[in-house]
Design a protein with these regions (language model features):
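A conserved beta-turn-beta hairpin within the catalytic core of GNAT-like acetyltransferases
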Residues: 68-81, 91, 138-139
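Conserved beta-strand in the GNAT
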Residues: 51, 57-66, 80, 85
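Conserved acetyl-CoA-binding loop-helix of GNAT-fold acetyltransferases
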Residues: 86, 92-105, 128-132
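Helix-loop element at the rim of GNAT/NAT acetyltransferase active sites that forms part
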Residues: 17-30, 72
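Conserved GNAT acetyl-CoA-binding A-motif
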Residues: 107-119
């Protein structure tokens, strides 16, 4: 049976393990700092973190926030899936659905009428999982950045 509940301080190590699975390229120090800041209440988002457990083992996580807007959404208060991860051994067993169902309930309880998410363009497995749970593709976005020069080099 899959249970989904809010993360607690005693879950910090399990949450970190799942975050490292989702973002293996991110420096562990950054991920650790974010978890610490979440429990201190100084991290602006996620606003909520829900952990999925199966047989007492943490097998998935969803990190949530409320955004004033999201691609393709019509309302000005959108529940947003900032992170969604299911451990490889627990995939295709209902864990992802249980997490999104809980995320939807969280959003509704906060007055949201829509829930949104994103994924990397090349992550087809994630896109399929989103579609299977009723998400509709709202657009494809490529993000760009440019370092700003200062002083006499600025133009």
């Amino acid at each position: 049976m899959i249970a989904v509940r809010p993360v607690t301080r005693s879950d910090a190590a399990e949450w970190m393990r799942l975050r490292r699975g989702l973002w293996p390229e991110e420096p562990e120090d950054d991920l650790d700092r974010e978890v610490a800041e979440f429990f201190e209440g100084t991290l602006p988002e996620p606003e909520a973190v829900l952990l999925a457990l199966e047989g007492g083992e943490a097998v998935g996580v969803v990190e949530l926030a409320i955004r004033p807007t999201a691609e393709g959404c019509r309302t000005n208060r959108v529940a947003y899936v900032e992170a969604w991860y299911v451990a490889p051994g627990a995939r295709r067993s209902g864990v992802g659905r249980a997490l999104i169902d809980a995320a939807e309930a969280w959003g509704r309880s906060r007055g949201c009428e829509e829930i949104a998410s994103d994924t990397e363009i090349a992550n087809e497995a994630s896109a399929r999982a989103h579609r299977a749970l009723g998400f509709e593709e709202a657009g494809v976005v490529r993000c760009f950045r440019k370092q700003l020069r200062s002083g006499k080099d600025a133009r």
